[in-house]
């Protein structure tokens, strides 16, 4: 049973996390309900740029930004599917509003807009997503697999991927290197 809504929160993988998909990750939760949770890993770039992705989709772009804009590994589910996390929410064919400021879009129209220089003000593009069955995320939290903190869009959209985990930890006032692999409940 869902006890807290983690939508628009970060999940910070604890040092003891051994799952190779999630070790040392920062995951942004886009949706959390009694039906489960959906999130995107926001600190693990893959060897693909936005220009590469647009080329694969036969969407032409001469925008220099797309040549150096990294694509993130969003999670191990549907690795062939693209997800665009963006500010503002805007109006796209297939958008889920995470909150009043952040949207998650899966339709090609947003990629075409990006290629034409008409993209949302802030964006992160990922392949794949992270998903949890009903009650799974709560179970993992009870086993101390994750720390949670309300998300900061500035961390997602304004910092390089390699700085995001540390910045999220600072929101909690915690240094990642000081965390123990051995944790328990009082």
Swiss-Prot record:
Q: Output the PANTHER family linked to this UniProt entry.
A: UNCHARACTERIZED PROTEIN YQGE, UPF0301 PROTEIN YQGE
Tell me the Pfam families matching this sequence.
Answer: DUF179 (PF02622)
Q: Which organism was this protein described from?
A: Nitrosospira multiformis (strain ATCC 25196 / NCIMB 11849 / C 71)
Q: Which family does it belong to?
A: Belongs to the UPF0301 (AlgH) family.
Question: Gene3D superfamilies per the record?
Answer: VC0467-like
One Gene Ontology cellular component annotation? cytosol
Protein name stated in the entry? UPF0301 protein Nmul_A2478
NCBIfam families attached to this UniProt entry: PRK00228.1-1 (NF001266)
Q: Cross-referenced InterPro entries, in alphabetical order?
A: AlgH-like
């Amino acid at each position: 049973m869902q006890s807290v809504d983690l939508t628009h929160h970060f999940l910070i993988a604890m040092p003891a996390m051994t799952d190779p998909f999630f070790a040392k990750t920062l995951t942004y939760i886009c949706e959390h309900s009694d039906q489960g949770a959906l999130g995107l890993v926001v600190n693990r770039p893959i060897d693909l740029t936005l220009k590469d992705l647009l080329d694969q989709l036969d969407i032409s772009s001469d925008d220099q930004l797309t040549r150096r804009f990294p694509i993130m590994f969003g999670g191990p589910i549907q690795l062939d599917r693209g997800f665009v996390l963006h500010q503002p929410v805007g109006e796209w064919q297939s958008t889920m509003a995470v909150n009043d400021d952040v949207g998650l879009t899966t339709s090609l129209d947003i990629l075409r807009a990006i290629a034409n220089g008409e993209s949302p003000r802030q964006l992160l593009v990922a392949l794949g997503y992270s998903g949890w069955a009903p009650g799974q995320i709560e179970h993992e939290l009870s086993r101390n697999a994750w720390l949670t903190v309300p998300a900061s869009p500035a961390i997602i959209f304004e910092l390089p991927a390699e700085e995001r985990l540390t910045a999220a930890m600072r929101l909690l006032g915690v240094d990642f290197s000081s965390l123990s692999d051995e944790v328990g409940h009082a």
